[in-house]
């Protein structure tokens, strides 16, 4: 009966460990920083286009 809590704790620990498959990356995976940089570039382009056509938004 004393082994039951130990067994339950081990099961919980095993379930919380990330699997090996979750950490493997495919060829087309990009780091998160590049997505952030792309979003910033898109925002800057939209702002520059807006300011080019409409002076009020600058």
Curated annotation (Swiss-Prot):
InterPro entries: T-conotoxin
Prosegment residue ranges: 23-46
Highest taxon, organism lineage: Eukaryota
Keyword Transcription: no
Signal sequence, start to end: 1-22
Subcellular localization, as worded in the UniProt entry: Secreted
Gene Ontology terms for molecular function: toxin activity
Any Pfam family hit: Chi-conotoxin
Tissue: Expressed by the venom duct.
Entry keyword set: Cleavage on pair of basic residues, Disulfide bond, Secreted, Signal, Toxin
Principal place of residence: secreted
Gene Ontology, cellular component aspect: extracellular region
Posttranslational mods: 5 disulfide bonds are present in each homodimer: two intrachain disulfide bonds per subunit, and one interchain disulfide bond linking the two subunits.
Family as reported in the entry's similarity comment: Belongs to the conotoxin T superfamily.
Subunit structure and binding partners: Homodimer; disulfide-linked.
Domain remarks: The cysteine framework is V (CC-CC).
Designated name of the protein: Conotoxin TxXIIIA
Organism: Conus textile
Lineage of origin: Eukaryota, Metazoa, Spiralia, Lophotrochozoa, Mollusca
């Amino acid at each position: 009966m004393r082994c039951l809590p130990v067994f339950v704790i081990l099961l919980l620990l095993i379930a919380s460990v990330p699997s090996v498959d979750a950490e493997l990356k495919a060829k087309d995976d990009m780091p998160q920083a590049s997505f952030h940089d792309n979003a910033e570039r898109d925002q800057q382009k939209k702002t520059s286009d807006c300011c080019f056509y409409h002076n009020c938004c600058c």
